[in-house]
């Protein structure tokens, strides 16, 4: 294992570890059980190496892998909460850390499954459950999330939100997290190298546009088809990169995070306090700023009428290119 970043817990704020987990090659339920044991082992060993560690993050697909021929089968799916999350909860409690985990979740109402992330606290309680709002279509078959973008209390004065991989390419997702009070946005990903530059760019822009820290980590290594880039990244609230990992499987990227500084920027900045300025436009000329929405896409999206001008000419609107049948029934 290699490591990049900080070694000790700061007096204020918290120490985080982003695990560039090797992409799992999963063929059976036994392989999933093996990954769960490995993740738990990694929690304990990382805590032993970094006694001040308070938040450990595992990337998307680290539990169940990316076997596209089997990933929606009953054998591969998990219930949330369920036996697998109970094991993660026990490990977090034993090591006294917050943990972020990836689960491909069986739909409790039937129909297509969800791509889910959870946060477990040092008491072993699941304090956040998030379902990916924007599956990476047309590759992914997951149902779009229906839990919104929840925020929870975390270590060192943090307010945590989680997004999953492709979610982070949408500035609206990061803005929603910040608008609901998050000062730290965690992004867990399973991207291959084709979008590594865009991934790093959006991690920075999501931080800057919302005056919040972003903690992002991707799978690492080769699964026989694609190479996954790792490159764990911690961005400051001003959009600069504090720590950047490499493309090594098992690299541990650590950083000291100071949520209070993001909070102070949101309260004290005039110039570039853009999350506030969005809803208070031109407050020098107009006391309190202009509140009315000037954005057509926001209005149309809210009314369920979002449509880009070239929509009728778009070529790919279903999953047939990746072998998924066109759906005949729409699940609510």
UniProtKB/Swiss-Prot annotation:
Gene3D superfamilies reported for this sequence: Carbon-nitrogen hydrolase
Name of the protein in its database record: Formamidase
Catalytic activity: formamide + H2O = formate + NH4(+)
Function: Is an aliphatic amidase with a restricted substrate specificity, as it only hydrolyzes formamide.
GO MF annotation: an example: N-carbamoylputrescine amidase activity
Keyword Signal: no
Active-site residues, as the UniProt record annotates them: 60, 132, 165
NCBIfam families: PRK13287.1
EC supergroup of this enzyme: hydrolase
Pfam families according to UniProt: CN_hydrolase (PF00795)
Keywords assigned: Hydrolase
